[in-house]
């Protein structure tokens, strides 16, 4: 990748060979590579993406070396690495970085192969959001923010609309018109007109986020079947506590001898019912 910072310095990722800074005046390169004897050297040679935040901090996403912060030093750039630590839940969730983004609230977000991470500038720690938090998948390829402050995140299993304040997620897949479930890292763009583009394995999708409407109504949930000791209960059956259909029953009273029971429930939403989530 090639990246130009706010000082018009041109950085070139050699991918396997570290990072190069192009000197426009001398038409030459300054090379930065991993050096185990130098704690201030770049921590990994496989650089995939770079990003400059509003504070002029430059962040480097690597393939296997985590997230790297680059700042000015007396004798050149000083590199600080942030890596995944399985013993520290506040560490970066993966050392494989796909995307780096600063939102409208000046929070730094990192898309990785194991979730979407929010970086805390004060504590130097990370908070990860994953599939269990509602994302379509843990592999996050791209991050774009809309005018409402929501993130549209491309993943390995569709696109997620993520509200970072209230932690609410809406997921979209091929049933909604996506080119495929899987998208491609580095292939996302917000145009000057506000149109979003996400590239995938079977083409690309483009849309204006304000035109993607969701249904805010929460469907009612009903108990549809009821079992006692693996026997399906119906009105009129011996030992059945039901006096009417289970969907019309407001209360069930059981003796202590009928203490092993189970039930089945469903939401009355038949439009893409597979998207129903129960919390």
Predicted regions and their residues:
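Residue-level "micro-hotspots" composed of small/polar
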Residues: 34-46, 75-77, 84-101, 119, ...
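Residue-level detector of Asp-centered blade-edge/turn motifs that repeat once per structural unit
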Residues: 4-8, 51-55, 102-106, 145-148, ...
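Pyridoxal 5′-phosphate
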Residues: 29
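Sequence-structural signature of mature extracellular/luminal beta-sheet repeat domains
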Residues: 4-12, 17, 58, 65-68, ...
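Beta-propeller domains
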Residues: 54-55, 61-71, 95-122, 148
């Amino acid at each position: 990748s090639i990246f130009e910072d706010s000082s018009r310095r041109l950085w070139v990722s050699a991918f396997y060979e570290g990072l190069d800074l192009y000197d426009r005046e001398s038409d030459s390169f300054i090379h930065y590579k991993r050096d185990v004897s130098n704690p201030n050297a770049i921590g990994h040679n496989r650089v995939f993406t770079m990003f400059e935040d509003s504070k002029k901090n430059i962040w480097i996403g690597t393939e296997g070396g985590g997230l790297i912060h680059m700042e000015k030093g007396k004798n050149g750039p000083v590199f600080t690495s942030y890596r995944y630590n399985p013993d520290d839940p506040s560490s970066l969730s993966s050392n494989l970085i796909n995307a780096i983004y600063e939102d409208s609230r000046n929070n730094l977000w990192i898309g990785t192969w194991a979730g979407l991470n929010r970086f805390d500038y004060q504590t130097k720690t990370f908070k990860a959001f994953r599939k269990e938090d509602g994302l379509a998948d843990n592999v996050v390829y791209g991050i774009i923010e809309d005018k409402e402050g929501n993130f549209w995140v491309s993943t390995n299993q569709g696109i997620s609309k993520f509200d970072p304040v209230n932690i609410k997620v809406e997921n979209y897949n091929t049933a909604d018109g996506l080119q495929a479930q899987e998208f491609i890292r580095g292939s996302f763009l917000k145009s000057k007109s506000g149109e979003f583009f996400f590239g995938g394995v079977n083409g690309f999708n483009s849309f204006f986020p304000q035109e993607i409407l969701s249904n805010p109504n929460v469907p009612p949930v009903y108990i549809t079947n009821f079992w006692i000791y693996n026997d399906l209960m119906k009105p009129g059956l011996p030992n059945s506590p039901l006096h009417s259909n289970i969907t019309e029953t407001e209360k069930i009273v059981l003796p202590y001898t009928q203490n092993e029971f189970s039930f089945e429930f469903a939401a009355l939403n038949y439009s893409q019912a597979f998207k129903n989530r129960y919390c």
